[in-house]
Each structure stands twice: as structure tokens, then as C-alpha cells.
């Protein structure tokens, strides 16, 4: 039987009483006389929105927040020499109509702030507290809307001496893996060492072929003009219940054993695949066409998740590639099958989505974007922060107590978080659904674990 991490929301601080002390622009330490632009791939093009993460640190007497703030500012200035695009601005190239980055040296944001609370008084760091948005700055009030930085770093000190690093990046700048590399490089400079992994900023490595060649059906993508509903990336004003379900390493192990018993061995039975299969079954069976109706078992459900393609291309992308080197894998099936098929078969369907993404398939998807200007679309997207390892980065003042994204109301996205207790094999599943769907989701979650 599965157990929810939070049966009901904990008491959350609605206001962290954060005061902005200083808001400035920072620039690369090495000036360049060459004005250039950075090409953005078709994968980057559709990710023009901000991603915000918060990294909480316990007090360290050897590193008071004031000292940490100054060290971070100096390290970021130096780091932007390697990541100069972070000081640039997004623009639309009038000749092509494509987004690119104008590497104009306009600067990144650096904000210092203070909260009237201690870190402990913030309470549960895992539960998606909307107030955590106060720990991140996405727009600098001193700048016009068309001149906002792609990267803003905020350090917020707490009364106990702990602090939070809040980072807002436009998603065109990094994917999860390259952002982890960025944090590791930042930590290296803070340790007064060379960059651990010098970045590869050449986005033309994922440029579409000329002429484009779409060799596969791409059910995971939809053309802009063909989609009347919102994308999986848009927030909703609909009231949603948040619930976090915790899966221990032992429960994940049992799910893998159960899947192995009923699978045909064509795909690997991984922790991610079994958790994603569990989420897909629960989400699909919780959706009703109309209020009060049961789930239409003949309805097709599509689940999406990101797959890193760095090692799948020929030639392979450098591991240090900074852009979005992820494509959307999918699995598609009728709800009837998700209800009746053995769990191992559902896991196979999930795994086949990843297995499908070969070099040729990836190039076909990129070329599809060149021709049709669309985006990923499905019933649910699993966004996994589970094994990105942000909390494993070792800074001079230690590792984060917890690292997490700032969560907004998105009912079509289920988030996977690592265990705050350091058990990297356990996972939190965060779902945000209307109340009636949430009760069904929980029912099927517990039913699947039985």
C-alpha cells in the first residue's frame, strides 16, 4: 500500500517577509569588441519561458551570507566569460523569424535579499509553497520588459545564518543536465579551481538538416495551428489540489520486480520507467470526460517525458553541450489497456518511448520542428528532477539541504523530486489535479501498489 507524503497540506508560510537589499546587473569580466548572436536550435525555440530553482543551505559559521554573496557575485562574473550568452538578450531575427540570443553584453541580474524567518521556520521544503517564488527574481524592475536578463541570481539570507540561492533562467539557455554542469562549474570557481567542464555553446550541432527530412510519425508533437487546447507548459487558473506521494526505494524495487515478471524483456525495467508507468496509469484512469462520468476506457491517453539525446546522436554531442539536448518521448494507449494490462506491459510501453529515440529519429524530430513549428503535446508530462543531482553539488559551504523548482499550477505536469533525506533511490511524486481527479488518482496509485 502506498502512503502519501502529505495527506493534507502542511501549514505554510504565505509570506516569507523577504526584503530586496540590492538589485544590480553583472557582466562578464572579459570585455569583447565582437558583437555576435547565438543560434538557437528548434528544441530551444519552443522553450521560451523561465525556469526557477531554489537551493537551500544550512548555516555555516565559516561562511556568513554576506561573505557568500560577495563570493558568488565574483564567481558568476568570471563564469560568464565561458557562458557569455547569459549576459545577452533574446531577440527575433527579422530575416528568419527565429529566436536567437543577441550576445550584446547587456548583463545578467544579481539580487541580494533577506528574510525575517529562519530556515527551519520555512517548514516543509518539499511541499510546493507558492511563497518560495519570493526567493527568486525573474524580472528586474529597473529594466523595461524588452530588456530583461536571461539569467537572474538571487541570494536570500535567513535570520539563522542559512540562505537560499534562487536562480531564474530562460529555458532556452539550459536543460537540466547543462544547468547541473553550470552549477558544478560555479562550485569549481568558488573552490578557486578551473572549470570542471568547460561548456560547449555551439547550438548549431542540433541544427535542422537542409533540406529537412521527416522520416517518422511524430505523435508527440502538434502543429501550433492544429492545437486548440493549452500546452503542457502553460499554467492554469483552475483550482487544483496538490498532493505529494512518496515512493521509498523498497517500493520502487518491488515495482521493478513486478514489472520484470510480466514484461517480455525488450526494454530495461528502470526505476524511472516503473514510476512513470505508475503515474500514467493513475492519471489516465482519473480523467473523466464530463463531471460525474466514469473514465471513458476507449479514450487514448498519451504520456510524455524528456530524453537526453547527447549520447544517442551520431556523432555524439559533447557532454558539455549547454543547450536543450532533450527530446520528448511518448507512450500512447487506450485507457482500457492501462486498466487491464499487466503492469509490466505498461512499463514496456513507457520504455519503448525512450528506445524509439535513435539518431535518425532525433534528427527527424528536429527537422519536423523546422517544417511545422510545433511543440510537444499530450495528456500528461512527467518532469523528472529526480536524478539531476542539483543537491549533490559541493560548494565551499557544503551541499544544499534541498534543491527544487518553484512550482506553479500545471495540472498536466507531474513532477518527480529526489528524497530530501538523501535517499537518492526514493522519489516524491507531485501531482496537481482538480479535487475529484485527485481522489481517483490516489485510489489508482494505491491500487497499483497493492
Curated annotation (Swiss-Prot):
Keyword Secreted appears in the UniProt entry: no
GO biological process, one term: regulation of DNA-templated transcription
Keyword Methyltransferase applies: no
SUPFAM superfamilies (UniProt xref): CoA-dependent acyltransferases (SSF52777)
EC number: 2.3.1.-
Predominant subcellular localization, coarse grouping: cytoplasm
Disruption phenotype: Female gametophytic mutant which exhibits embryo development without any endosperm due to a successful sperm cell fusion with the egg cell but an impaired fusion of the second sperm cell with the central cell, thus resulting in single fertilization. Embryos can develop up to the globular stage in the absence of endosperm.
Organism domain of life: Eukaryota
Keywords: Acyltransferase, Cytoplasm, Fertilization, Nucleus, Transferase
PANTHER family for the chain: ACYLTRANSFERASE GLAUCE, TRICHOTHECENE 3-O-ACETYLTRANSFERASE
Name of this chain's protein: Acyltransferase GLAUCE
Record organism: Arabidopsis thaliana
Amino acid at each position: 500500500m502506498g502512503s502519501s507524503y502529505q495527506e493534507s497540506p502542511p501549514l505554510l508560510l504565505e509570506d516569507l517577509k523577504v526584503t530586496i537589499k540590492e538589485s544590480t546587473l553583472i557582466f562578464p569580466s572579459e570585455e569583447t569588441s565582437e558583437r555576435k548572436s547565438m543560434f538557437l536550435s528548434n528544441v530551444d525555440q519552443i522553450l521560451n519561458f523561465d525556469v526557477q530553482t531554489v537551493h537551500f543551505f544550512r548555516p555555516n559559521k565559516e561562511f556568513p551570507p554576506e561573505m557568500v554573496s560577495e563570493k558568488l557575485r565574483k564567481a558568476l562574473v568570471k563564469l560568464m566569460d565561458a557562458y557569455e550568452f547569459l549576459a545577452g538578450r533574446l531577440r527575433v531575427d527579422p530575416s528568419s523569424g527565429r529566436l536567437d540570443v543577441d550576445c550584446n553584453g547587456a548583463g545578467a541580474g544579481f539580487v541580494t535579499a533577506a528574510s525575517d524567518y529562519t530556515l527551519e521556520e520555512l517548514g516543509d521544503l518539499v511541499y510546493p509553497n507558492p511563497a518560495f517564488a519570493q526567493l527568486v527574481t525573474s524580472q528586474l524592475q529597473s529594466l523595461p520588459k524588452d530588456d530583461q536578463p536571461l539569467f537572474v541570481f538571487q541570494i536570500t539570507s535567513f535570520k539563522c545564518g542559512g540562505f537560499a540561492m534562487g536562480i531564474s533562467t530562460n529555458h532556452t539557455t539550459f536543460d537540466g543536465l547543462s544547468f547541473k554542469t553550470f552549477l558544478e562549474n560555479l562550485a569549481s570557481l568558488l573552490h578557486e579551481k578551473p572549470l570542471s567542464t568547460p561548456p560547449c555553446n555551439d547550438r548549431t550541432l542540433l541544427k535542422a538538416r537542409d533540406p529537412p527530412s521527416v522520416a517518422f510519425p511524430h505523435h508527440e508533437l502538434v502543429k501550433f495551428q492544429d492545437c486548440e487546447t493549452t500546452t503542457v507548459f502553460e499554467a492554469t487558473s483552475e483550482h487544483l489540489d496538490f498532493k505529494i506521494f512518496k515512493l521509498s526505494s523498497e517500493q520502487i524495487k518491488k515495482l521493478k520486480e513486478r514489472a520484470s515478471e510480466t514484461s517480455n524483456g525488450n526494454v530495461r525495467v528502470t526505476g524511472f520507467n516503473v514510476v512513470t508507468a505508475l503515474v500514467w496509469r493513475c492519471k489516465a484512469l482519473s480523467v473523466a470526460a464530463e463531471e460525474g462520468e466514469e473514465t471513458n476506457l476507449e479514450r487514448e491517453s498519451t504520456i510524455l517525458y524528456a530524453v537526453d539525446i547527447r549520447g544517442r546522436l551520431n556523432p555524439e554531442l559533447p557532454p558539455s553541450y549547454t543547450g536543450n539536448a532533450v527530446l520528448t518521448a511518448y507512450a500512447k494507449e487506450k485507457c482500457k489497456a492501462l486498466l487491464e494490462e499487466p503492469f509490466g506491459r505498461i512499463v514496456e510501453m513507457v520504455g519503448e518511448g525512450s528506445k524509439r529515440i535513435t539518431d535518425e529519429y532525433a534528427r527527424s524530430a528536429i527537422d519536423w520542428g523546422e517544417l511545422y513549428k510545433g511543440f510537444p503535446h499530450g495528456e500528461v508530462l512527467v518532469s523528472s528532477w529526480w536524478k539531476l543531482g542539483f543537491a549533490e553539488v559541493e560548494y565551499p559551504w557544503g551541499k544544499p539541504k534541498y534543491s527544487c523548482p518553484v512550482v506553479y499550477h500545471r495540472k498536466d505536469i507531474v513532477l518527480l523530486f529526489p528524497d530530501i533525506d538523501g535517499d537518492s533511490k526514493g522519489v516524491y511524486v507531485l501531482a496537481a489535479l482538480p479535487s475529484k481527479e485527485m481522489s481517483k488518482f490516489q485510489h489508482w496509485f494505491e491500487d497499483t501498489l497493492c
